[in-house]
Amino acid sequence: MSANNGVTGKLSSRVMNMKFMKFGKTDDEESSNSNTPSNINSDVEPIEQKGKLFGLDDSAWDLNSYKDDLKKISGKEKKKVKRVVYKKRPNLIISNVGYSELRKPEGVISGRKTFGDNSDDSGSRKRKFDEGEQNEDEKRDAKDKEFTGSQDDGEDEYDLDKLFKDSIKKKKTNHNGKNKNRNSKK
């Protein structure tokens, strides 16, 4: 390819901006070469006066000059902020993190509380009440066994299982008999 041919294809916006900046610089050089009276004096004038007359030219993309301008304007150099890096703590592993474990009321006495009573007395009362309930439950279980007779749990399960299987067999025989009747009617 020859150098005279233009660039074909799409150019990115950065490349296009660089091209325009290049053309802007060449235009400035050509205008400074002309012999107009304002341009003759412009070589002598400092940059600050140009900035006052024409405003700052933002087309120049020079970050260092921008920082220098900021230093001149503010009169102070900006301090660099030191970043403090904190070391991350190791993760704590907790074994019981379930909802019921987290919501467990610790030190809370469930039930009614009368004002003016000591908490120690109410705790001992509660323990006595719980023990009384357990004794009553044991007594009920003993009475139930006496009433029903001394059957073991294994025998009860065997009887229930046998009844269940018999009921399933009856349902199957009834269902098959109905299907035979329907087929014969058709």
From Swiss-Prot:
Paired cysteines (S-S): none
Composition skew (Low complexity), residue ranges: 32-42
Signal peptide: none
Recorded family membership: Belongs to the MPP6 family.
A single GO molecular function term of this UniProt record: protein-containing complex binding
Record-listed N-acetylserine modification sites: 2
Disruption phenotype: Lethal in combination with the absence of either RRP6 or its cofactor RRP47. Weak but detectable stabilization of unspliced pre-mRNAs, and stronger stabilization is detected for mRNAs with defects in 3' cleavage and polyadenylation.
Keyword RNA-binding recorded: yes
Subcellular location: Nucleus
Subunit comment: Associates with the RNA exosome complex.
Region (Disordered): 22-47, 95-186
Composition skew (Basic residues), residue ranges: 168-186
Task of the protein: RNA-binding protein that associates with the RNA exosome complex. Involved in surveillance of pre-rRNAs and pre-mRNAs, and the degradation of cryptic non-coding RNAs (ncRNA) derived from intergenic regions and the ribosomal DNA spacer heterochromatin.
Top-level taxon: Eukaryota
Keywords: Acetylation, Nucleus, Phosphoprotein, RNA-binding, rRNA processing
Phosphoserine carried by residues: 42, 150
Gene Ontology biological-process entries: exonucleolytic trimming to generate mature 3'-end of 5.8S rRNA from tricistronic rRNA transcript (SSU-rRNA, 5.8S rRNA, LSU-rRNA); nuclear mRNA surveillance of mRNA 3'-end processing; nuclear mRNA surveillance of spliceosomal pre-mRNA splicing; nuclear polyadenylation-dependent CUT catabolic process; nuclear polyadenylation-dependent rRNA catabolic process
Bias (Basic and acidic residues): 122-147
Gene Ontology cellular-component annotations: cytosol; nucleus
Additional note from the record: Present with 1350 molecules/cell in log phase SD medium.
Protein name as catalogued: M-phase phosphoprotein 6 homolog
